[in-house]
Every structure is written in structure tokens, then in C-alpha cells.
Amino acid sequence: MSDFVEIYEVGPRDGLQTEKRLIPTAAKVALIDLLSQTGFRRIEVASFVSPKWVPQMADSAEVMAQIHRVPGVRYTALTPNLRGFDAAKAAGADEVAIFGSASEGFSRANLNAGIAESLERFAPVAAAAKAAGIALRGYVSCVSDCPYDGPIAPGAVASVVAALRDIGCAEISLGDTIGRATPDRIDAMLMAVLNELPAGQLAVPPSATPATRPRRWRQCWQKKGFSPV
């Protein structure tokens, strides 16, 4: 097991985006400022998506303008398209993230596009990030199970990881989106993914059901070089 584990904090974005009650901008800023004092080196604070689809993130530019930035902390934003990237860049994002899926059904439901089309959409974002010298991170959802398509083949996950790697993602987070994976399924998926990207460039978010969480994550930590996020 690695002696170093980095925790990448996503609460201000992923944790808040589905809240039905609109949270005041000042409260979001206060949360991020507190997190900035805890020792996190990277915090995902905003999502530059259409407010029609994610109203909670409509004030992302204001949030990024008002936070008190701590030296050594990188503030990240989710940017699904070039318009979102341009807004994140203008807001001073230190890093941007794009998100895809290993499931066709989930991709169409959440991105209104199949896997291949969604990856094509990300290419201009990746190119713009590279030109601007802004680090690019990738997310892959449904790496084990999908609410629409059921179990996902390890090769399908590896294929999306390879595509995100090829367009410039320096790190890729593997999401067990609905928390149904088992240790054996995770192991098979990781073995396929590790053929495309080294462990040091992969992250694993701790989503799980209470019954599977302890066994799953003991096994993940044994994969040298993984960082939880």
C-alpha cells in the first residue's frame, strides 16, 4: 500500500449539486473557506453547466470570485463543454474536470449523448485546457453497474479511460455510481483499467452500500498508488 493517500474534496460541487433547496452563495463560500483550512490540496468547488439542468450550480462564477484562496490549494470546476471551460477559466479555476460514462444508457440519460459522441464533445475542452496550461481531470461513472444497463463490462470502462487519457486527462476518477459493486467486480475492472493507465493516475471515490464498503475499500487500498477521491 502507498504511504501517501490524497483526498480530493468534491463536497462543494458533487455534494451540493443535487440539493433541492437552493443554498445561498455565502453559505457555499463559507463551506469552501473552511475546507481550505483543513489541509486539502485540491477542492472541487463549482460546476459550469447549464442552470436549467443543475440550478444549484448557477452561482458558480460568484462562488469562485468570493472564496478566500489559500496558497497551495487548487480549486477545480466541472466543465462539460467549451462554454463551461471558458467560464471556469475566467473565474480562475486552477483545474477543470470532464465527465463521461462507461454505460451507454447512463450517458444518454445524463449527457444526452452516447459514449462516443460525449467523448467527441470533450475534445475541444481538452485542447483548450492544454493551450491554457490548465490541468484536466476525467470522471468515469458506472464503472461496475448502471441503473439502466445493469452490470458493465471491465473492457468498456478501460475503453473510456483510454479515450480520456488520449485527449489529455492527467488523472481519472472511477465512479461506482450506484454503489453496487463487489470486491471481485472491482478487481476485474481495475485489472482492465490498469492496462491503460498506471495506478498513480487513477482515483477511486468511496461510493458503496454499507454491506460492501469495508471489503471493497480494503481491497482498493491494496492497489499500490491509488488515491481516494
Would you name each region that the model predicts?
Residues 1-229:
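Catalytic cores and adjacent flexible loops of soluble metabolic enzymes
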